[in-house]
Design a protein with these regions (language model features):
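NTP-dependent small-molecule kinase module
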Residues: 57, 82-124
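Alpha-helical elements of Rossmann-like donor-binding domains used by nucleotide-donor carbohydrate transfer enzymes
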Residues: 2, 31, 79, 83, ...
Length: 124
């Protein structure tokens, strides 16, 4: 809730907002889309993807002292993976018919991040 409150405050002031979060459920995406629609801003979803073994290897190298994430353990990753709901742009558009939406999928399997690339894009 605090994340959405802060985004609302920025948007209210005419600024842009990036909500950096693991939106694994469509209901969270709906909340963010509603904010963008309220302030007539384009809503961009940046979804990252890479092979499971790459993700788990990265998680294994993380430590609580050096990294802020909700996926600090293999189990946390697996839990998020199980709960993940496919991004449904049609649903977001039905709820916010005047909202411009872009969904980007970024392949993050390679290191360093400069080697990441957009592997998919859909606009509504």
């Amino acid at each position: 809730d605090e994340t959405f409150r802060q985004a609302d405050e920025l948007l209210k002031k005419g600024k842009g907002a990036i909500i950096d979060a693991t939106f694994i459920t469509q209901s969270l995406r709906r909340r963010a889309a509603a904010l963008a629609a309220k302030y007539k801003r384009t809503f961009v979803i940046l979804q990252t993807q890479c092979p499971r073994e790459v993700s788990l290897a990265r998680i294994a190298r993380r430590s609580k002292e050096k990294y802020e994430s909700n996926a600090l353990t293999e189990q946390a990753y697996i839990n998020n993976e199980k709960k993940f709901e496919k991004v449904d742009l049609g649903d977001l558009k039905r709820l916010n018919p005047n909202l411009d939406i872009a969904h980007l999928i970024v392949d993050t399997q390679f290191d360093p991040p400069e080697d990441w690339y957009i592997s998919g894009m859909e606009k509504k």
